[in-house]
């Protein structure tokens, strides 16, 4: 009985000495260039691929519903994503990831790029931005793997932040 008690106390002590914490990351995917009537699975596919990688890396992940815009805003995003950013911040997110899934024209069902921007919710500063090719997979399964590969690049870049 004493051995069990000692092991339990040692585990508890280790947990107190080395606190376990994970950063919380909130995702918002915005499809740009499509008409409102267009139907595509790529937004959900990219969102899932990116979120899976972050989750597997130990982050707590949340998301907002996929949105649509006629075109990607140039710089100031506050008028477009302010509510989603505010909700993520109130929920305790440390980072806010925006993925602009860009389509060449309104009739296209295949995207050509995914522009990912990551903001620190405490400072509201852009800490990462990169464009990834999208729509290059021969099928949805391959496209999902492309999204996951992009997520791995992003997660590896976040380790130093």
Please annotate each region the language model reported.
Residues 98-138:
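Amphipathic beta-strand/beta-sheet edge segments enriched in Tyr/Trp
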Residues 9-19:
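Bacterial N-terminal signal peptides
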Residues 132-161:
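C-terminal partner/receptor-binding element of secreted or periplasmic proteins
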Residues 25-30, 79-108:
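A short, hydrophobic beta-strand-centered structural micro-motif
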Residues 20-24:
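Boundary at the C-terminal end of the N-terminal hydrophobic targeting segment
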Residues 1-10:
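Bacterial N-terminal signal peptides that target proteins for export
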Residues 50-58, 105, 122, 154-158:
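Sec/Tat-exported extracytoplasmic proteins
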Residues 37-91:
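N-terminal segment of the mature soluble domain
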């Amino acid at each position: 009985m004493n051995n069990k008690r000692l092991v339990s106390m040692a585990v508890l002590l280790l947990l107190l000495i080395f606190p376990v914490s994970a950063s919380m990351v909130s995702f918002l995917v915005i499809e740009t260039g499509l008409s409102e009537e267009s139907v595509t699975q790529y937004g959900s596919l990219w969102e899932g691929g990116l979120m899976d990688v972050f989750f597997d890396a130990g982050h707590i992940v949340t998301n907002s519903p996929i949105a649509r815009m006629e075109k990607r805003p140039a710089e100031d995003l506050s008028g477009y994503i302010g509510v989603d950013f505010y909700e993520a911040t109130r929920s305790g997110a440390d980072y806010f990831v925006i993925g602009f899934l860009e389509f060449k024209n309104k009739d296209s069902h295949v995207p050509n790029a995914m522009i990912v921007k990551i903001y620190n919710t405490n400072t509201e500063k852009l800490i990462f931005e990169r464009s990834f090719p999208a729509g290059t997979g021969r099928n949805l399964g391959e496209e999902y793997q492309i999204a996951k590969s992009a997520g791995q690049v992003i997660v590896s870049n976040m380790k130093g932040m």
